[in-house]
């Protein structure tokens, strides 16, 4: 997984298995935890791309693109904690599916709340400091 690759973190309702088969990895990864916990863990080792404005995105509520649900707020807090974009971009449902199919991998979480689906674009890891 390199600079510019996408990682999808999805809720239990997302068609993760079928979408994951179309990704670079080709298989689904699972972490049975709430979305915000998974995002926090991932972002502790996965830098967000600072060269683009869409390095962090959320699936938008159908018909309500500006609606921010609690799960989205929780994940936004984790993104903001690592200096990521605030707010995350809103991605229309079917556009999100298409972005997910082109991703490196999909992680399905144990998140049962609706619209707990997020896309993250990988940045670069700098050299070790001496």
Q: Each PLM stretch: what is its role?
A:
Residues 19-52:
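A phosphate-binding glycine/aspartate-rich beta-alpha loop in the early core of alpha/beta enzymes
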Residues 63-130:
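Glycine-rich, aromatic-bearing surface loops/beta-hairpins
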Residues 3, 40-51, 77-84, 123:
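Generic secondary-structure signature for well-ordered alpha-helical cores
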Residues 5-8, 28, 49-59, 86-88, ...:
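Structural motif
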Residues 44-75:
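Ordered, amphipathic secondary-structure segments that act as subunit-interaction surfaces
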Residues 27-34, 60-67, 110:
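Catalytic cores of large soluble enzymes that bind and process phosphate-bearing ligands
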Residues 1-31:
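Long, hydrophobic N-terminal alpha-helical segment
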Residues 9-16, 42-45, 88, 92:
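Membrane-targeting and insertion segments and their boundary/processing signals
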